[in-house]
Design a protein with these regions (language model features):
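Conserved N-terminal Rossmann-fold NAD(P)-binding element of oxidoreductases
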Residues: 12-17
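Beta-loop-alpha module in the N-terminal Rossmann-like domain of NAD(P)-dependent dehydrogenases
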Residues: 67, 77-93, 108-109
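C-terminal catalytic/substrate-binding lobe primarily of soluble NAD(P)-dependent oxidoreductases
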Residues: 3-4, 9, 146-385
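NAD(P)-binding Rossmann-fold cofactor-contacting core
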Residues: 32-49
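Hydrophobic/small residue at the entry helix of a nucleotide-binding pocket
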Residues: 19-23
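ADP-ribose/adenylate-binding Rossmann-like module
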Residues: 93-111
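Rossmann-fold NAD(P)-binding glycine/threonine-rich loop
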Residues: 105-127
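Rossmann-fold cofactor-recognition segment
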Residues: 53-66
Length: 385
């Protein structure tokens, strides 16, 4: 096993050009020696580059796993914008070629299984480096470090940590949501149980929308519900051992009125009829699309409140609230720019080999947040105590 990553070659392979591919790709065209965009066909890759204003700045390629593997060299970086089930085989090809790997998705079991081999080969595996997951991790690490410095790591305390993120229409519609890609993923996420800490107790919401609560951000009311499994992040975020969670939840943010507007959808989800839900996804895509005339909005609020007793309290919150433009959606900006930032740090050899989830350390998180702010991803920090 090596503690040193394979030296970067300077070549970046960006695989896939979906709706989350934005100005992050342009950043890599500025910083990497060579960029190759892999798409379904070479023509589609050329069209995607032209649409992004990057014609001639990256080499178009027709993607198959075999075609990519044939061009991989040691130290190349593969950026996967493909669905998560594709990441395991793609990482396997990277490990074999001793090429680095980066994505914005949660760590899948297939990626986790290959992580030891990647580290042994000197391959960096950067994951969870988009918006959510990604920027949310940076915010959490920064808040925890600040609170620990203020309260003390050895001080007994209780805390509440909430992390809510949502992509919503900038101008609310009656449905309180618009679909920028296939709704099946949104619907199936609502069918998955959510596990989190509430009132100091581990809680599971079998139907996450039933746990929806009002959530106020700077005077604006949203609706928030838990999503996926929050509990593993207790260990991942490394809060002091003497601090006990009152509430710890990572979840989804929606516009006020969403719960009521979606009542007919929830009734369909309750039936657990896969065929009907697939049909419903197609219906919703047609009824509530995000068109070229629409603008999206991304809101990410991460809050930490720590109570050490005797009036000793600390509270901090990061808020990101961005609206898309005609040139780039807010979601594309917030996913592609942190991912590209992570890739630049693979290129400059500042990331170690093995599995990483975004920046992971408080020091690296602070550095990345400074760089993201300089790169146009705006956010605000508020601290009390």
């Amino acid at each position: 096993m090596t503690d040193d990553a394979v030296p970067a070659s300077g070549t970046v392979h960006w695989v896939g050009a979906g709706l989350s591919t934005g100005s992050g790709l342009a950043k890599l065209c500025d910083t990497a020696a060579r960029v190759r965009l892999w798409h379904r066909t070479e023509e589609r890759a050329e069209e995607a580059l032209a649409a992004l204003g990057l014609a001639g700045r990256a080499e178009p390629r027709a993607y198959t796993r075999a075609a990519l593997a044939a061009e991989l060299a040691p130290g190349d970086v593969v950026v996967s914008m493909l669905p998560a089930p594709e990441h395991g085989p793609l990482l396997a090809a990277c490990v074999e070629a001793r090429a680095h790997f980066a994505c914005s998705s949660y760590v899948s079991d297939a990626v986790l299984e290959r992580a030891p081999a990647a580290r042994a080969a000197g391959v960096t595996v950067l994951t969870e480096a988009g918006l959510d997951p990604g920027i949310d991790h940076l915010f959490a690490h920064s808040l925890i470090a600040r609170a620990t410095a203020a309260i003390g790591p050895g001080t007994a305390a209780s805390y509440t940590l909430t992390s809510y993120c949502g992509g919503v229409p900038a101008v609310p519609n009656d449905f309180r949501y618009r679909f920028s890609w296939a709704p099946a993923g949104v619907l199936n996420a609502l069918r998955a149980p959510a596990r989190y800490i509430e009132d100091g107790t581990e809680t599971t919401a079998g139907r996450p929308w039933r746990a929806t609560r009002p959530y106020v951000v700077d005077g604006e009311t949203f609706e928030a519900y838990p999503n996926r499994d929050s509990v593993p992040f207790l260990a991942q975020y490394g809060l002091p051992a003497g601090w006990k969670p009152r509430t710890f939840v990572r979840g989804t943010l929606r516009l006020d009125g969403w719960l009521t507007a979606w009542a007919p959808v929830f009734a369909e989800l309750e039936r657990d009829d896969d065929v009907r839900i697939a049909a419903l996804a197609a219906e919703l895509a047609a009824l509530h699309p995000m068109t070229e005339a629409d603008r999206d909005r991304v809101v990410l609020a991460v809050t930490l409140d720590v109570d050490a007793g005797s009036g000793d309290r600390w509270s901090g919150r990061y808020l990101l609230d961005l609206t898309g433009t005609a040139e780039e959606s807010a979601m594309a900006r917030c996913v592609s720019r942190p991912l590209a930032l992570g890739v630049t740090h693979i290129l400059d050899a500042s990331l170690p080999p093995g599995l990483l989830r975004a920046a992971e350390t408080p020091e690296r998180s602070e550095s990345w947040l400074r760089e993201l702010a300089e790169d146009g991803v705006e956010f605000a920090l508020r601290v009390e105590g």
